[in-house]
Amino acid sequence: MPIKKILIVDDSPTERYFLNELLSKHGFSVTAVESAEEAAANLKGSLPDLILMDVVMPGQNGFQFTRQLSKDPVTQNIPVIMCTSKNQQTDRIWGLRQGARDYVTKSVKAEELLGKIAALG
């Protein structure tokens, strides 16, 4: 199934704006929220085709929320790409073990992210 709807979960207004502009310009329908809690509320109304997940956020972090999504029958098939400044190999491995399909580090390179999205869809 091609990816059309993307949910961005990132507490940085700058990152949300950059990702929203980039993805909208490439024809994706984008919703951007600033916390895992806000994302959980958003998922009750409509399911995206992909989630871009920051790790370091107030409240529930991105690793925890990705794990929660991967265990829920309603959301377990939605691919998650971790999109974060946490760039250690141990962070990447931990993110993948929590259920993420891929992992990119900030500052995000547009072509790399678009390539990863294309590979999932």
PLM region descriptions:
Residues 57:
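Receiver (REC) domain active-site loop signature in two-component systems and cognate sites
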